[in-house]
Amino acid sequence: MWCPDTPLVTYMIDMIVFSCRRFIPVILFVFTAVCFYTSPATASLNKYMAKHRGIEVSREQHKRLADYDKLIKHFCSFSFFEPRHKVNPDFIRALILAESNCKSTALSCKNARGLTQIIYTTGKQAARELVQKDFDYKYVSKEQLQNLQPEDLYKPEVNILLACYLVAKYNYQNHGKLDLVVSAWNAGEYSITDNKPAQYKETLNHIGKVNGYFLYLLKNKQSFN
């Protein structure tokens, strides 16, 4: 939605999955303009969106991401919740950059682990759900998922698989709205009220950061072709 009376507009991407159609196998994105309303919640989010609007990915970060490119592309090829709807690889790359700066051994003060900083209880539940699905994940066995241990979250193949699944889940639950997906990721899937992200500074900053990286990667796709 456009707000013609508002001079400042931040662009957000509402769709973080793409639909593989039979005749038009293109990535489908819906770009919407987030207007600077007077609502405190919206104004607060806009501040962090603007803060990270010009973020870039360095040469070194590109090189680190390339180490995980095979795994990202593979696990983003699964349609976990809807046929032909798959997680955009660039969103996973953006999440990795924002969460750990591509460090597979990263550990937060809240015991979030690995490339995408997954909490063990969240990862364990996601692993149980993945076991029930009729997929061969190739790089991660169902036995490994069934017996997931905290240290497994440091393994890139496990961490990226869980991240792709959780992003697909939150995307499905929140109708592809990036701010709500990242809010669910950062503050928990029950952090969303009235179709708005959690109003924590950390969460709002994280939404802006992931969105900034995502936009940069979309504009510079040749780096991963």
Residue spans of the language-model regions?
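Boundary at the C-terminal end of the N-terminal hydrophobic targeting segment
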Residues: A41-A43
